[in-house]
């Protein structure tokens, strides 16, 4: 039995820290829908809905300060993380949510329909087969095992002056060694999560 009052309280506490108090209801609706679908379709390994608040919602929202531009793609979005929380927080930005898993894209289409989120476009395709008409201002992912792999598989998606934004746990010392583009690493804290979190911002400086 889910204690909605407790979940709402956890949400409100964290959203106050992010100065995003107004989006609590929509995030709660998303969380409840994710929890419901997860029981059947195994969309995320996290089963405890209270843990989802911090590890899914708050961890996603923590990278908001570093998003660049209006045209964003979340590669390997899974059940819409970080894309859905970001899209809810920034309804003026456009988000493409890319994943090759049909169950996850079906879930995202249901989220879009039920929650009436107009600024997302879920697309089922492998990243190497996706060739949009224009590059994205920010390419986000927490799905790749290394920064080098992220750049390799998504370099055709980023705009000439765009940005890669990779979500990491510990400071990725060894992953940064082969990176030739200019980058910076921002450490951040997430309400309810102990341990190191950081965001790697890599500028697309290799294109002519």
Swiss-Prot record:
Gene3D superfamilies hit by this protein: Vaccinia Virus protein VP39
For this protein, the Enzyme Commission number is 2.1.1.170
Q: Name one GO molecular function term.
A: rRNA (guanine-N7-)-methyltransferase activity
Q: Does the keyword Metal-binding apply?
A: no
**How is this protein annotated for GO cellular component?**
cytosol
| Keyword presence, Transferase | yes
Per its record, the protein catalyses: guanosine(527) in 16S rRNA + S-adenosyl-L-methionine = N(7)-methylguanosine(527) in 16S rRNA + S-adenosyl-L-homocysteine
Instruction: Give the keywords, sorted.
Output: Cytoplasm, Methyltransferase, rRNA processing, S-adenosyl-L-methionine, Transferase
- Record: residues binding S-adenosyl-L-methionine: 76, 81, 127-128, 142
Q: Where in the cell is it found?
A: Cytoplasm
**InterPro entries associated with the record:** rRNA_ssu_MeTfrase_G, SAM-dependent_MTases_sf
Role played: Specifically methylates the N7 position of guanine in position 527 of 16S rRNA.
Protein family (similarity comment): Belongs to the methyltransferase superfamily. RNA methyltransferase RsmG family.
Q: What is this protein called?
A: Ribosomal RNA small subunit methyltransferase G
Native organism = Legionella pneumophila (strain Paris)
Gene name, per UniProt, is rsmG
């Amino acid at each position: 039995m889910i204690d909605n009052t407790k979940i709402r309280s956890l949400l409100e506490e964290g959203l106050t820290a992010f100065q995003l108090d107004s989006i609590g209801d929509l995030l709660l609706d998303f969380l409840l829908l994710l929890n419901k679908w997860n029981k059947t379709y195994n969309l995320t390994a996290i089963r405890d809905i209270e843990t989802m608040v911090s590890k899914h919602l708050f961890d996603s929202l923590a990278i908001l300060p570093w998003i660049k531009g209006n045209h964003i793609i979340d590669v390997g979005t899974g059940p819409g993380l970080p894309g859905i929380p970001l899209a809810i927080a920034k309804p003026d930005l456009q988000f493409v949510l890319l994943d090759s898993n049909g169950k996850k894209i079906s879930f995202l289409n249901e989220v879009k329909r039920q929650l009436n989120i107009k600024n997302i476009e879920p697309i089922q395709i492998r990243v190497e087969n996706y060739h949009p008409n224009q590059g994205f201002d920010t390419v986000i992912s927490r799905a790749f095992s290394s920064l080098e792999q992220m750049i390799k598989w998504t370099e055709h998606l980023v705009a000439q002056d765009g940005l890669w934004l990779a979500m990491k746990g510990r400071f990725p010392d060894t992953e940064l060694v082969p990176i030739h583009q200019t980058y910076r690493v921002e450490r951040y804290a997430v309400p309810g999560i102990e341990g190191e979190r950081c965001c790697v911002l890599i500028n697309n400086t290799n294109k002519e």
